[in-house]
Design a protein with these regions (language model features):
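Rossmann-like dinucleotide-binding domain for NAD(H)/NADP(H)
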Residues: 216, 220-313, 324, 357, ...
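Oxidoreductase and adenylate-handling cofactor-binding alpha/beta cores
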Residues: 87-106, 154-159, 285-298, 334-338
């Protein structure tokens, strides 16, 4: 039986996918698998028996990926499971920036005791007038699951949409509307677009990408939307641009003291994926990925190990080896197994950066002696008997 610990409340729809072979427990130290949403794991001691961490969501900056990789702990996420929920809020944010609905609502609240509020509204409403998005230019930076949905929806709203992503996947490209203009240089988006929305992961190369230099290349009165990661924007630079009028509105899903309550900022309390549907979808996907890995050793949607799928093992045994991505590892594995007079019926080796993952189906059950011999090979992080 596999024991699973939840560091955050996880949707019952997802947990209901667990079979009788699984038990949800309160103590992470006894768990083979961990399900997490936003809880930080950076300061946690990871138990030796922990095999997998599944993030019910896309972002994994709350998980120590390198530390997990070195311990042979596979970290999964759920890309695309919350894409529609985030997309809808991005579109809502864009509409709120185009027309001062928030300001109008606040005026109504402040005027609640005015018996002639309807008459007063006719005089005051011009203060909250805005523009329509139809015919405007939207730049989408990052054409992953969310970016593609935002771009396609904006096309249906009658916007002229430009997309930038030098690493766009084949699947994303197939799903992208033909009406979206794919640009090869992000500065084309900066120069031409009325609205710019960013949908990229937080990396060293993307941190603070929306800064003073980037903003200087944008159209006057541009609207910036950030529903991806808070640190993608240098918000001090954004506030300076708001004061000068270079940026008309900054819409963010990440509340913090820098932008909260600032003129021109529409700050939402991190509601992007906070829908029942998104939480259910993320939980189901996270649970299914973890189950396939724990039961079969297959890796799908990992952020620290390569994808690998050998289906269900039909042989007597299956071994998974986590190791450095260096030469001569496979030769050493097969030599050790051969010395034990065990035949290998199938084998898969995949690498990702500095780490690699090898699965071997063998015609005899794996012995403790075999596991220890493989573990002694220099460069091996972990040896796991899957079956």
């Amino acid at each position: 039986m596999f024991q699973i610990n939840c560091l955050n409340p996880i949707s019952k729809v997802g947990l209901d996918r667990l079979t009788a072979d699984y038990k949800v427990i309160d103590n992470m130290n006894d768990a083979e698998g961990v399900l997490v949403r936003s809880a930080s794991m950076h300061e946690l001691d990871l138990p030796e028996n922990l095999l997998a961490v599944a993030r019910a969501g896309a972002g994994v900056n709350n998980i120590p990926l390198d530390k997990c990789a070195e311990k042979g702990i596979v970290v999964f996420n759920t890309p695309g499971a919350n894409a529609n929920g985030v997309k809808e809020l991005v579109i809502a944010g864009m509409l709120l920036a185009a027309r001062d609905v928030v300001g109008g609502i606040e005026w109504v609240k402040a005027s609640k005791d005015n018996a002639d509020i309807a008459k007063a509204a006719e005089k005051e409403k011009k203060k909250f007038a805005g523009t329509e998005v139809m015919g405007k230019k939207l730049g989408v930076i990052g054409l992953g699951a969310i970016g593609v949905k935002v771009a396609n929806t904006a096309v249906s709203l009658g916007m002229e949409v430009y997309g930038y992503d030098p690493y766009v996947s084949v699947n994303a490209a197939w799903n992208l509307s033909r009406s979206v203009k794919h640009v090869m240089n992000v500065e084309e988006i900066y120069a031409d677009c009325d609205y710019i929305t960013i949908h990229v992961p937080l990396l060293d190369s993307t941190k603070g990408m929306i800064n003073k230099e980037a903003i200087s290349k944008m159209k006057d009165g541009v609207v910036l939307l950030n529903f991806a990661r808070d640190l993608l924007a240098n918000e001090a630079d954004v506030l300076e641009a708001l004061k000068s009028g270079k940026v008309a509105r900054y819409v963010s899903d990440f509340p913090n003291p820098t932008t909260a309550g600032q003129p021109g900022c529409i700050v939402i309390p991190h509601l992007g994926a906070s829908t029942e549907e998104s939480e259910d979808n993320c939980a189901k996907m996270a649970v299914e990925e973890m189950m396939d890995y724990l039961e079969n050793g297959n890796i799908r949607n990992s952020v620290n190990y390569p994808a690998c799928d050998m289906g269900v093992c039909s042989q007597a045994g299956r071994i998974a080896i986590f190791h450095k991505n260096i030469t001569n590892m496979l030769n050493q594995f097969t030599a050790v197994i051969g010395e034990k007079n065990i035949n290998i019926s199938d084998m898969t080796n995949r690498s990702r950066g500095e780490v690699a993952y090898t699965m071997l189906d063998i015609e005899s059950a794996a012995t403790q002696d075999l596991v220890e011999a493989l573990q002694k090979i220099d460069g091996v992080f972990r040896v796991r008997v899957v079956k």
